[in-house]
């Protein structure tokens, strides 16, 4: 019913937000059958009207499609850049990964850091986690900075990112790149384990089994 209503409204207004919403519903099969090809067409329409969410979704579909031509991939990169410039955090994160890995563009760690930071400040936990990992590893273009890594990993963990929670737990347990804090480490590893993170479950199991840092349970 909602889907039919959106279609009717769109026919009257040709509104980019409605076009994006229809595309999203078709992509996820919400209120209608799942239809990726139709979703892509709606995202195309909304994209032409500069809807950043549609630009991001469309770029993502093109990148994930093995039959995409180099020309389509270049257009997808253009759309993703536009969406990132418009402040879409998922686009900023996706574009950051492209520059970090040098996928179809020249590798640019500084640009990746700038994009990840923009997305992270919008509470994108994956971007914050990516920043934490970059600062922890260091690179020719980015000096290793354990304090910055700890800051971003903590932020991502607080946002509920299980991968950051696991990484932070390990960091606090080892006490090399961050002050050792077994209590906090167990708290973060438990939070990750409760989200089904197998690495965290294994690390906790090992801790309790050996009973070195914690009393045997």
For the regions a protein language model found, what residue spans apply to each?
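N-terminal leader/linker segments that initiate helical-solenoid repeat arrays
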Residues: 1-5, 10-13, 17
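Short helix-capping/linker turns of helical repeat alpha-solenoids
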Residues: 12-15, 28-30, 48-52, 64-66, ...
């Amino acid at each position: 019913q909602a889907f039919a209503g959106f279609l009717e409204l769109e026919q009257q207004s040709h509104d980019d937000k409605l076009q994006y919403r229809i595309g999203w519903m078709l992509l996820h099969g919400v209120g209608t059958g799942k239809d990726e090809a139709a979703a892509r067409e709606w995202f195309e329409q909304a994209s032409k009207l500069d809807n950043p969410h549609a630009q991001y979704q469309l770029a993502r579909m093109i990148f994930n499609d093995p039959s995409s031509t180099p020309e389509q991939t270049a257009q997808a990169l253009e759309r993703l850049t536009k969406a990132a410039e418009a402040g879409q955090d998922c686009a900023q994160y996706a574009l950051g990964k492209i520059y970090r890995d040098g996928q179809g563009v020249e590798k640019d760690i500084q640009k990746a850091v700038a994009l990840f930071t923009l997305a992270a400040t919008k509470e994108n936990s994956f971007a914050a986690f990516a920043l934490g990992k970059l600062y922890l590893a260091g690179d020719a273009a980015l000096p290793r900075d354990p304090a910055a890594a700890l800051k971003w990993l903590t932020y991502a963990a607080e946002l509920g990112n299980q991968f950051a929670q696991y990484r932070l737990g390990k960091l606090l347990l080892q006490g090399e790149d961050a002050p050792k804090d077994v209590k906090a480490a167990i708290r973060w590893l438990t939070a990750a384990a409760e989200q089904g993170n197998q690495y965290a479950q294994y690390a906790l199991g090992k801790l309790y089994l050996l009973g070195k840092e914690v009393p045997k349970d």
